[in-house]
Amino acid sequence: MGTSAKMQKYDRQVRLWKAEGQNAIEKSHVCLLYANTVGCEALKNLILPGIGSFAVVDDTSVDFSMDGMNFFIQYDQEGKSRARCTASLLQQLNPNVEMEYLEMSPEALIDKNIEYFSKFSVVLSSNLKEKPLFRLEEYLRSHKIPLLHFNSVGFAGILRISTHEYTTTQSQPELPQDLRLKNPWPELINYVKSMDLDNMDSSSLSEIPYIVLIIHVLLKVSPAHAQNSQEADDCAMFRKIMEEYKGKCDSENIEEASSNSWKAFKEYKLPSNVYEVLHDTRCVKIQEDSESFWIMAHCLKMFYDETEFLPLSGLLPDMNCSTQQYVKLQVIYKEKSENDILKFKKYVQQTLKRLNRSVEEITDLEIKHFSRNCLNIKVMDFKTMKEEYQPTSNSVLESSSIDSNSLLPWYLAFRIYDTILEKHGKNYKEAFSDTTKTISVAQSFLSQIGLEKFFDVVYTAIQELERADGHELHSISSFIGGIVAQETIKLLAQQYLPLNNTFVFDGVHSRTETFKL
């Protein structure tokens, strides 16, 4: 498929994650362990956006008593390989996506050939037993491959994300724009001074961008480039001058300048997400094998330490002004941004040489992208499931007070549910046939984590899972699969922030909640 045809096909999603995000998705390879309904729904929502390839690993045969809700199983496929049946139908959604299937138990594959997973960009798993799950997680983390483990039973669903770390330059928060109103650079100051705003007629004044108006007033208020403009006298004088302009020219740009004047009195400060990255040990003490993100973060810290500012993005907001004035101002901001990129590039190349690495290892495009998006950088660390499952290691659970609105009982119910199945096999009726045994396992589990006082509310959730008899409801699995796919795309494209780290859905009351466990 040609580039233009591809962009037309994926037009809507490219608007969300742009061409670079789409390219990352198209290069990705996704593996699904166990082709149950929720797993197939997750894959469906990844195949449609155009992942590069997918693999289904499953040794079970189609059983309509359990697979009847799966839209990717046909009525004449009873007893056939579930991996082959689902993989072939899933591929029909997007023939450009390559497909493979493996008729083998995921647990056996993890035990005998765990290296198989090294070729994937992300692994999706459901219904894995605890021991192979932990082993797979450890292997994937060592290869920097995200793992998404999930389940859907009856009216409830759960998702857990595990990855060694998540770094992005496109976290997409609602950050204030970096316009440097309080700290204009010489070229911007000279441009503002070149215009005689005080002697302009109202028509000419109405064409001036509010940025120019604000800096002009600041320079009048405080000749030292508004360095003392936090003082009450300066603020009062600023408001007085703005009122004079309003009286002279009652236009929208003057109103914009007044409504945005607070930005002129705000001290330059690192956003919390940037501060966390620049003070992270991985940034401060980079190593020869440090990833590109941390090398550039280290260089960003050097840039900030020297200039007391981050590189300028060069982006301007929409403003009420003439096109000619807007373009002139845009050129000044763009030139400043380009100069900051060149300065940042020097730091990157010097650092790479110091680490005995090639200066070509980080491309000019990567440097430019990082520099212009540095306000959006973010790092997230994820606790391992193995750590989470240790009875004494989870401070979130230990300090929890479960109220009527909390979905923590559902999380605990899923943990106990999996424990019972692991002890008594995957025959649901057999595993939950003895109520006394179920109660005993639940009490023991809650006692280990100090939450035995919440037995009643947790046991109610367990009974709801039992009532499903191991079956999935398509509407619930479709929803959970959509969430899994959404979070997977974030991880693949390295855009936006994935949930950290557990998502729980209660379909009975249509409620969701996330926990950092």
Curated annotation (Swiss-Prot):
Protein name from the UniProt record: NEDD8-activating enzyme E1 regulatory subunit
InterPro entries registered for this protein in UniProt: APP-BP1, ThiF/MoeB/HesA, ThiF_NAD_FAD-bd, Ubiquitin-activating_enz
Keywords of the record: ATP-binding, Cytoplasm, Nucleotide-binding, Nucleus, Ubl conjugation pathway
Transmembrane segments: none
SUPFAM superfamilies xrefs: Activating enzymes of the ubiquitin-like proteins
GO molecular function, one term: NEDD8 activating enzyme activity
Signal sequence coordinates: none
CDD domains named in the record: APPBP1_RUB (cd01493)
Species assigned in the record: Schizosaccharomyces pombe (strain 972 / ATCC 24843)
Example of a GO biological process term: protein neddylation
Subunit comment: Heterodimer of uba3 and ula1. The complex binds NEDD8/ubl1 and ubc12.
Family statement: Belongs to the ubiquitin-activating E1 family. ULA1 subfamily.
Involved pathway(s): Protein modification; protein neddylation
PANTHER family documented for this protein: NEDD8-ACTIVATING ENZYME E1 REGULATORY SUBUNIT (PTHR10953:SF29), UBIQUITIN-ACTIVATING ENZYME E1 (PTHR10953)
Compartment(s): Cytoplasm; Nucleus
CC per GO annotation: cytoplasm; cytosol; nucleus
Pfam families, sorted: ThiF
